[in-house]
Structure formats: structure tokens, C-alpha cells
A protein has these predicted regions:
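Cytochrome P450 core scaffold surrounding the K-helix E-X-X-R motif
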Residues: 43-49
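NAD(P)H-binding Rossmann-fold N-terminus in SDR/SDR-like oxidoreductases
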Residues: 157
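Glycine-rich beta-strand-centered segment in the early N-terminal region that forms part
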Residues: 22-40, 52-95
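Short gly/ser/thr-rich secondary-structure transition/capping motifs
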Residues: 12-18, 53-54, 131-132
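Conserved hydrophobic/aromatic beta-strand scaffold that supports enzyme active sites
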Residues: 18-23, 69-71, 103-105, 111
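NAD(P)H dinucleotide-binding glycine-rich loop of Rossmann-like/cofactor-binding domains
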Residues: 57, 90-153
Length: 158
């Protein structure tokens, strides 16, 4: 499969290379998604998770990108709630290969069904901004049921 990889932390965006990589395989509770649209922010190049795994071991060459929309092509052992051929969107794990590729292996819990009337590019643009808004309202703002919110100047992605 084609994928954009990074290998040199100091090269920044100039260090991104389009290359051939093996297609991922689905582990337990994983889903393989054929990517139709993907999101990427340049600051990912500064995140430790782009370069290391959860044990802080080097994982380069790595594939950046976290937001995605696409179609399920395979299910790992024990995966439930999704089916092959289903349209989905979601967030890839920060410490695994990302979404700047033709396929990604992702935990099923990080995906949601994408309605048929929602374009893949729209679906891929929602996860980070939606999560950021949710965290702002509920985790940081401690919003409770029945409370009101004024969204002043709500013109950005969040």
C-alpha cells in the first residue's frame, strides 16, 4: 500500500516521504479500514507519539495522521459492532501507525458508523474538533445536564 512515512524528527514536514508499506493486519478487536479521507496537523511532527511507542521505544519509520473516514475491509478476532463494507469515521491511536496511508489497523472502539449522506472528507474532519469541543464543555467546563452554553464566535473547527 502507499503511505506517507516519517523517519527524521529534525526534518519536519520536509521529512515526509511517500513510499510502499505492507498492508496492516488486524489484531484482536482491530478493524482494517480502507482510508477515503484523512486528517493531519503539522504539529503531529512534534508529538512524542509520532516517534515512539507506549514504552518510549523508537517506532520509526512511522505513519502520521489520526483522523479518518473510510470503509471497513477486515475485522480482527473478537471484533464486534462493525462489519466489512461499513462506512466509518474516527481517531487512530496516537502510538500506532496513522491514517496517511491507504489502509490502517485501528481498534474498533475508536470508530463510529458514518451515515451514507455524510461525505468522507466531512467525516474525517470531525473527530479532533468534536473531541476538543466535548473536552472543553464536559471535562474542563464541567457542563451538566440542563445547563446552557453560549457559543460566542463559533466560526472555527471546534
Amino acid at each position: 500500500m502507499k503511505a506517507i512515512i516519517v523517519t527524521d524528527r529534525t526534518a519536519g514536514l520536509a521529512g515526509m516521504t511517500l513510499t510502499e508499506r505492507p498492508e496492516p493486519s488486524a489484531a484482536i478487536n482491530d478493524v482494517i479500514v480502507q482510508i477515503h479521507a484523512s486528517g493531519f496537523v503539522p504539529t503531529e511532527m512534534e508529538w512524542p507519539s509520532t516517534w515512539t511507542d507506549r514504552r518510549n521505544l523508537d517506532r520509526t519509520p512511522s505513519i502520521p495522521g489520526h483522523e479518518l473516514a473510510g470503509v471497513v475491509t477486515a475485522l480482527g478476532y473478537g471484533t464486534t459492532g462493525l462489519s466489512v463494507g461499513q462506512r466509518v469515521f474516527g481517531l487512530a491511536d496516537w502510538h500506532r501507525d496513522g491514517t496517511l496511508a491507504e489502509y490502517v489497523a485501528i481498534e474498533a472502539r475508536n470508530l463510529a458508523p458514518l451515515p451514507g449522506d455524510v461525505d468522507f472528507t466531512v467525516g474525517a474532519s470531525l473527530p479532533i474538533s468534536g473531541l476538543t469541543a466535548w473536552q472543553g464543555l464536559f471535562q474542563h467546563g464541567r457542563l451538566q445536564a440542563g445547563q446552557s452554553v453560549l457559543a460566542h464566535g463559533a466560526a472555527g473547527a471546534v
